[in-house]
Swiss-Prot record:
Belongs to the aspartate/ornithine carbamoyltransferase superfamily. ATCase family. Pathway: Pyrimidine metabolism; UMP biosynthesis via de novo pathway; (S)-dihydroorotate from bicarbonate: step 2/3. This is Aspartate carbamoyltransferase catalytic subunit 3. It comes from Shewanella halifaxensis (strain HAW-EB4). L-aspartate binds at residues 85, 167, 228.
Length: 310
C-alpha cells in the first residue's frame, strides 16, 4: 500500500499535494465511520504547546488516545526548561523527539515548526506557528467542506474578518486553490489578505475578489468562513475599532443557497450571533468535532502504512 505521507513532517499545507490532501480527507471519513482503537498501540506522541490552545490541543490528544496511542508533553512552556531555564527550541526538540514517535507542536513564532523539523528525530506536525500556518486546522476544514458539499471542486468560498493575522485562512486558501475554487475576501483594509497569498492565487490563475462588506456576496456562496479579530495581536483601541467590522446574524442568511455552510475556526466572540446557531447553515460546532477525525487521519498516515493507495 502506497502512503506518501508516512514519516513526513507536516509543517505547511503547501507541503502537501492535492492527492495527499484527498488521501487525508478520505482517511478521516474512513476513521469517522470505522473507529480503529488499536491503530497506534505502543506509539508515543509528544503534544508540546509553547502557545496556549484549547480545541487544537484537546482534539489532538483525543485523536491519539482514540487510536490507542499515548501522549506526553505540556500545555504551556512556562514550566519547562525552555521557559524557565532559557533552553533553546532546537535543544528542546532534539531531546523530546527522542522520547516519541511523532512531535505535535504549537508556537507563537512564525517558522518555529520548520526549525523544529530540522532538529527532530520524529516527524513534526505543526499545530500553528504565530500568524503563519495552521495545517491541521485546514485538514479539518477540508474534511468539513467535503462532508457538507460532497466535493472540494469549484466551490464559491468567502473568508470574512481577520484575513491578515488569521493563519487558518492562509492555509485553507492555499489548499482550496488546488481545487479550482473561487474566493471572496471580505475584510477591512487593515486586516486584508497578505500579498503573498494573493500572488500565489494569481500565479495559479485562481479567481478571487476583494470586498469591504458582506452585502451582495452571500447568495452565491457554498462556504462562508468567518473569523474573529484576534485580540492578542492588537492594542485595545485598535481591537475595539476592528472587532465589530463584520458580524453575521440569522436575518442575513435569508435567500442563501440551501447547501451553504457557515464555518469558523473558533473561538467566536461576537462575529456570529447566537441566532445563527439554530439555522441549518451553522456547521462550526460539527467542524470543531471533525478536528478529532482529521487529526486521527494525519496521525494514522504519518505513523502507519495502514492507509493509502492500494
Amino acid at each position: 500500500m502506497s502512503n506518501p505521507i508516512y514519516n513526513k513532517h507536516i509543517i505547511s499545507i503547501s507541503d502537501l499535494s492535492r492527492s495527499e490532501l484527498e488521501l487525508i480527507v478520505s482517511t478521516a471519513n474512513d476513521l469517522k465511520q470505522n473507529p480503529r482503537p488499536d491503530l497506534l498501540k505502543n506509539k508515543v506522541v509528544a503534544s508540546c504547546f509553547f502557545e496556549a490552545s484549547t480545541r487544537t490541543r484537546l482534539s489532538f490528544e483525543t485523536a491519539v488516545q482514540r487510536l490507542g496511542g499515548s501522549v506526553i508533553g505540556f500545555p504551556d512552556s512556562g514550566n519547562t526548561s525552555l521557559g524557565k531555564k532559557g533552553e533553546t527550541l532546537a535543544d528542546s526538540v532534539q531531546v523530546i523527539s527522542s522520547y516519541c514517535d511523532a512531535f505535535f507542536m504549537r508556537h507563537n513564532q512564525e517558522g518555529a515548526a520548520r526549525l523544529a523539523s530540522e532538529f527532530s528525530s520524529a516527524p513534526v506536525i505543526n499545530g500553528g506557528d504565530g500568524s503563519n500556518q495552521h495545517p491541521t486546522q485546514t485538514l479539518l476544514d477540508l474534511f468539513s467542506i467535503y462532508e457538507t458539499q460532497g466535493t472540494l471542486e469549484k466551490l464559491q468560498v468567502a473568508f470574512v474578518g481577520d484575513l491578515k493575522y488569521g493563519r487558518t485562512v492562509h492555509s485553507l486558501t492555499q489548499a482550496l486553490s488546488l481545487f479550482d475554487c473561487e474566493f471572496h475576501f471580505i475584510a477591512p483594509a487593515a486586516l486584508s489578505m497578505p500579498d503573498y497569498i494573493i500572488d500565489e492565487l494569481k500565479a495559479k490563475g485562481c479567481k478571487y475578489t476583494l470586498h469591504d462588506h458582506l452585502d451582495g456576496v452571500l447568495p452565491n456562496l457554498d462556504i462562508l468562513y468567518m473569523t474573529r479579530v484576534q485580540k492578542e495581536r492588537f492594542d485595545e483601541t485598535e481591537y475595539q475599532h476592528l472587532k465589530s467590522s463584520f458580524i453575521l446574524n440569522a436575518n442575513m442568511l435569508e435567500g442563501v443557497k440551501e447547501n451553504l455552510k457557515v464555518l469558523h475556526p473558533l473561538p467566536r466572540i461576537d462575529e456570529i450571533t447566537t441566532d445563527v446557531d439554530s439555522t441549518p447553515y451553522a456547521y462550526y460546532f460539527q467542524q470543531a468535532k471533525n478536528g478529532v477525525y482529521a487529526r486521527q487521519a494525519l496521525l494514522a498516515l504519518v505513523l502507519t502504512n495502514e492507509f493509502g493507495d492500494k
